[in-house]
């Protein structure tokens, strides 16, 4: 089932997400719905707060980026209660976008490599080192779990230059090719 993507301005995007308990109802179905929602919106990642749920869950499928970024080939994961164990000091600045901020793309610096621990939808624990663009996707999506969005990482002047677009998103007057839920609509 395709879920609405909550847009910038929705309060759930600014909340610290809660850990997912092992007895969370219909977790596998939620993961499937989030993947379907992400694919429908042509995204490579989606966090639970973006579908209105303040829980620590993200889904990622970077495979579509595999031609340009080989580390993304086959990189499909559901990360439950993810935790960064290490982040490299070396950062790379690249342009990012977000399904919750349609039409906005800005350059953001992120760690080149991260070591992350998480559980999958079968409650199997994983710890892995993720590099390059795949690491960028993981960091971007996990940032949603802390009540932040990528625009928070750009300079005040860049945010000011995007103010009109941000207001359009909040009002719900921005055009979206996917099902979305704005504050003003």
Swiss-Prot record:
**EC class of this enzyme?**
hydrolase
Q: Which cofactor does it need?
A: Fe(2+)
Annotated Fe cation binding sites:
98, 140, 144
Q: What is its EC number?
A: 3.5.1.88
InterPro entries hit by this protein: Peptide_deformylase, Peptide_deformylase_sf
Q: Write out the catalysed reaction.
A: N-terminal N-formyl-L-methionyl-[peptide] + H2O = N-terminal L-methionyl-[peptide] + formate
Select a single GO molecular function from the record's annotations and give it. Answer: peptide deformylase activity
The cross-references to PANTHER family, in alphabetical order and at most eight, read: PEPTIDE DEFORMYLASE
> What is the protein named?
Peptide deformylase
Species name: Parabacteroides distasonis (strain ATCC 8503 / DSM 20701 / CIP 104284 / JCM 5825 / NCTC 11152)
């Amino acid at each position: 089932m395709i879920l609405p993507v909550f847009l910038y301005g929705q309060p759930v995007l600014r909340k610290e997400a809660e850990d997912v308990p092992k007895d969370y109802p219909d977790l596998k179905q939620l993961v499937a719905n989030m993947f379907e929602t992400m694919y429908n919106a042509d995204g490579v990642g989606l966090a639970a707060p973006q579908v209105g749920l303040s829980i620590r869950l993200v889904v990622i499928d970077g495979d579509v980026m595999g031609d340009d970024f080989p580390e993304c080939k086959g990189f499909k994961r559901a990360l439950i209660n993810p935790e960064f164990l290490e982040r490299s000091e070396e950062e790379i600045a690249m342009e990012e976008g977000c399904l919750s901020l349609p039409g906005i793309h800005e350059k953001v610096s992120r760690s080149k490599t991260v070591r992350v621990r998480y559980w999958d939808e079968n409650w199997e624990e994983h710890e892995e080192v993720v590099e390059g663009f795949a690491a960028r996707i993981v960091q971007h999506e996990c940032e949603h779990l802390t009540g932040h969005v990528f625009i928070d990482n750009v300079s005040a002047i860049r945010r000011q230059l995007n103010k009109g677009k941000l207001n359009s998103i909040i009002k719900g007057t921005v055009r979206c090719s996917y099902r979305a839920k704005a504050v003003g609509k």
